[in-house]
Design a protein with these regions (language model features):
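Conserved Rossmann-like nucleotide-cofactor binding loop
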Residues: 24, 47, 176
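N-terminal FAD cofactor-binding segment of flavoenzymes
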Residues: 55-94
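Conserved N-terminal helical subregion
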Residues: 5, 9-13, 81-182, 190-195
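Conserved FAD-binding catalytic core of PHBH/FMO-like flavoproteins
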Residues: 69, 162-163, 168-267, 273-275, ...
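Glycine-rich FAD pyrophosphate-binding loop
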Residues: 33-56
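FAD/FMN-dependent oxidoreductases across multiple families
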Residues: 244-329, 333-336
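N-terminal Rossmann-like FAD-binding beta1-loop-alpha1 element of flavoenzymes
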Residues: 15-41
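C-terminal helical "tail/cap" subdomain of flavin- and related membrane-associated enzymes
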Residues: 323-414
Length: 414
């Protein structure tokens, strides 16, 4: 038990309580609501754009994540804010003796119009929250301050003084998850001594739907198209000391540094957006589900910002959990029972493990000065460049999990 709750005073209840109103939590609440059970979403409402700090962070969503948003009936409100990513370009700008060749992955090689879409985090959360407020029984604008779990239910005390109960608790409350702590789930962390800057900028040349990952010895710069053809979002990863210095530069000097790092790839740079600095870490929950609690998104796993895996992984968590609960409902079973939690662990384990290991290995290989590792990375890159079938296979593996997609994410699903 975390905190103290008067069980006798609880008045509001639901089959499922989802804690966290970020993108993954809202998607989880909507997906679970769609399978026919009562869901309460708990967390703060999005800030009013007029009073909130400028938010320039974006999310690159794969096609399967977009399909999920369509099933949840929110994509129509988002597509005008989204930019298609048609090409992913990887550039090795290191000074390695065994430098890897530049590679372009094209969605058209898979018969796709785009790998996915890049969209503002603020727009994504606003549309999801509006939909949740419309279709869910309750969306409570309060934080969870204490949680107690017994054999048949989960009890939550909220910051507004209210108390609620549910049979399944979904923890979508991020890296410092109170849900994870209350369920007694420990974590393993992977420090990288890196930080990142998220921002946006304007550029003289058209981006043409191309996302570029430019890798150097100590980090990377990734640009992702925005709806304006002369604007892109930015993730700059580097040593903590370097990122701290870059954050302190005025806009003009930062633009000069960015232009130098990109080598004029997108033409003259201007119109730098607000910059947000965040640590680059890796985190894995030691189990995805226990004690009537299922973890999704960053409560379960945190990855370095490479390959746009993080949020897409969280969306697959949410959709897979909805599948597991749907099976339980058809069989008239407890949605928070041990069999449902075990089913969720099986459904998500391999996908999360392969993505976590893959991103960790790639990040460490980019930082390593060990010549055999550099040689291996260069050899793989040469193979990808020279062998189209291998390149197509890698693209498919990057976009979809090794196991079957959850039902709400399958193309053509109802």
């Amino acid at each position: 038990m975390s905190g103290s709750i008067d069980i006798a005073s609880i008045g509001r209840g639901s089959e499922i309580a989802v804690v966290g109103t970020g993108p993954t939590g809202l998607v989880a609440a909507l997906a679970l609501g769609k399978v026919g059970t009562s869901v309460i979403a708990l967390g703060p409402a999005p800030q009013n754009p007029a009073s909130a700090p400028v938010e320039t962070r974006t999310a690159a969503l794969f096609a399967s994540s977009v399909d999920l948003l369509k099933r949840l009936e929110v994509w129509d409100g988002l597509k005008s804010e989204a930019a298609p990513v048609k090409v992913i370009r990887i550039i090795d700008a290191s000074k390695s003796l065994l430098r890897a060749p530049d590679i372009e992955f094209k969605a058209s090689d898979l018969g796709l119009g785009a790998f996915g879409y890049n969209i503002s985090n603020a727009a994504l959360v606003a549309v999801l929250y509006a939909r949740a407020s419309k279709v869910l029984p309750q969306v409570i604008e309060a934080n969870v301050e204490a949680i107690a779990i017994d054999r048949s239910k989960v009890l939550l005390a909220l910051s507004d003084g209210a108390e609620v109960t549910a049979r399944l608790l979904v923890g979508a409350d991020g890296r410092r998850s109170i849900c994870r702590k209350s369920a007694g789930i420990s974590t393993s962390e992977r420090p990288y001594d890196q930080a990142a800057i998220a921002s946006s900028f304007r550029h003289g040349r058209l981006h043409q739907g191309v996302s570029t990952e430019l890798h150097k010895e100590n980090g990377s710069v990734t640009t992702v198209p925005l709806p304006d053809p002369h604007a892109s979002s930015l993730i700059w990863v580097g040593p903590r000391s370097e990122i701290a210095q870059l954050t302190q530069l005025d806009a003009g000097l930062f633009e000069e540094e960015l232009n130098a790092r990109l080598g004029g790839l997108l033409g003259p740079i201007s119109g730098l957006g607000a910059r947000a600095e965040f640590p680059v870490t890796g985190l894995s929950a030691d189990t995805l589900a226990a004690n009537r609690t299922a973890l999704v998104g960053e409560a379960a796993h945190i990855l370095p910002p490479i390959g746009a895996q993080g949020l897409n992984l969280g969306f697959r968590d949410a959709a897979a959990l909805a599948d597991c609960v749907a099976v339980a409902l058809r069989r008239d079973r407890d949605p928070g029972g041990d069999d449902v939690l075990a089913s969720y662990r099986r459904a998500r384990g391999l996908d999360i493990l392969t993505r976590t290991l893959g991103v960790d290995l790639l990040n460490r290989s980019l930082l390593s000065q060990f010549l055999p590792l550099q040689a291996a990375r260069g050899l793989v890159s040469h193979g990808l460049k020279a062998l189209p079938p291998l390149r197509r296979l890698v693209m498919r593996l990057g976009l979809t999990p090794p196991s079957e997609l959850p039902s709400l994410m399958r193309p053509g699903a109802g």
